[in-house]
UniProtKB/Swiss-Prot annotation:
Catalytic activity: a ribonucleoside 5'-triphosphate + H2O = a ribonucleoside 5'-diphosphate + phosphate + H(+); a ribonucleoside 5'-diphosphate + H2O = a ribonucleoside 5'-phosphate + phosphate + H(+)
UniProt: Mg(2+) 1 binding residues: 87, 103, 107
Annotated active site: 23
SUPFAM superfamilies the record matches: FomD-like
Keywords, ordered alphabetically: Hydrolase, Magnesium, Metal-binding
Organism for this UniProt entry: Latilactobacillus sakei subsp. sakei (strain 23K)
Protein name, per record: Nucleoside triphosphate/diphosphate phosphatase
Gene Ontology MF terms in the entry: magnesium ion binding; nucleoside diphosphate phosphatase activity; ribonucleoside triphosphate phosphatase activity
Organism domain of life: Bacteria
Amino acid sequence: MNAPKEGDYIAIQSYKHDGSLHRTWRDTMVLKTSENAVIGCNDHTLVTESDGRKWVTREPALIYFHKKYWFNVVAMIREGGVSYYCNLASPHVMDQEALKYIDYDLDVKVFPNGEKRLLDVDEYEAHSAKWHYSAETDRILKANVKVLVDWINNGKGPFSKEYIDIWYNRYQELAHHR
């Protein structure tokens, strides 16, 4: 399949380890694709949960996926500053239908003041036992938590102000020319 181009809209689908669909985001504008990474933005996009519940995101969010890392990053742009929601997840794949990944439950939330919280450890442990996450998967995920925290602490990639400014401005340019 051809990679989506700048300005194209894609869906994002999150799955669980057992293959069940977890959550879908309907419209994310692609801002950049490379061999390994996808950067996009969505704003007031429809989200559908696995139980059929639907809701709409409240603010613009830049998304970052990379094929070499077991996490993805959502930077929510709010009046009080940027908050981040980071999912520990498989590297993404892209097909005709959507950008897809497996959500491995653990999340890191970063508040505008820099405070970090590791979330959903209980859910991770329960699903690890239920779906028999391998020792290798567990090792990879824990190593990627360390990489992620290092990126956060050092303002690397999506955690830098410049990144947010560049990509959110690009989104606004593209969105207003439609």
